Amino acid sequence: MNILTAKTTEQVRAKNVRFTGNVLHVLLSDRREISLQFNEVPWLKWLAKATPKQRANWSLEPGGFAIYWPDLDDGMEVCHLLDTQPIA
């Protein structure tokens, strides 16, 4: 008889977002921080084209699993920031 046991894993969430120049910094719930030069990442061109005011107006989606910029009507999921493959 096979018995399956549930494996509980905690999904990493975004806790805070900040910008320094052309770098996006995302603080994660496990205390790591991801930093990306958004002007050099092809799938973040929409963020590179935004004004500093538009970039500053962000919100965390419920649970912190995504970041959304209402002025840009765009966002990203934390799992994509952690993935080595870029979003198409």
Residue ranges of model-derived segments:
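Motif-centric detector for short Cys/His coordination patterns
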Residues: M1-A88
